[in-house]
Regions:
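Hydrophobic transmembrane alpha-helical segments in integral membrane proteins
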Residues: 16-39, 139-141
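Juxtamembrane boundary at the C-terminal end of a transmembrane helix
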Residues: 129-143
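Loop-to-helix transition at the N-terminal end of transmembrane alpha-helices
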Residues: 51-67, 88-91
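N-terminal amphipathic/basic-hydrophobic helices that include classical n-h-c signal peptides
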Residues: 1-22
């Protein structure tokens, strides 16, 4: 069966199926790259002794939109999948992914010094770790 043909199979049958792209495919990679770029950007602002500004808010909004899509895609995949994995843990990590950047921004925005920007940088650095952890939980036990 060709890869293109596998891509159109529905529902997803397990962790090796090509339909799991929202959790393990290019979409997750985009989230990781965007989060790392934002972290570097935030650390540049920290080094320049700058507080959080609207430009970093715009970047955080893009990341948040990607993470909401990750949450929705992950839940849809979970509901249409037949393989065994820790579903509550999976949803917990997905929800945490969506909540961490806004929490970091509220905290960082309230601190109008470079420390506030550092809080944002840490929140952005947490995202790649969380995405990889979602992928590990999706893969199931023994993966």
């Amino acid at each position: 069966m060709s890869v293109e043909h596998q891509w159109h199979r529905w529902p997803a049958r397990g962790p090796t199926d090509a339909r799991i792209a929202a959790v393990t495919g290019p979409y997750a990679t985009v989230i990781i790259v965007v989060a790392l770029v934002l972290a570097v950007w935030a650390f540049v602002l920290v080094a320049a002794n700058r507080p959080p500004n609207l430009s970093i808010l715009a970047g955080a909004a893009v990341l948040e939109a990607l993470l909401v899509g990750f949450l929705v895609g992950g839940v849809v995949q979970m509901l249409t999948s037949h393989h065994s994995f820790a579903k509550a843990e999976f949803v917990g990590y997905l929800v945490a992914c969506v909540l961490i950047p806004p929490a970091g921004f509220v905290w960082g925005w309230g601190e109008k010094t470079r420390s506030g920007t550092a809080v944002l940088a840490v929140a952005f650095l947490i995202m790649p770790v969380m995405v990889v952890r979602v992928q590990q939980v999706w893969a199931g036990p023994g993966a």
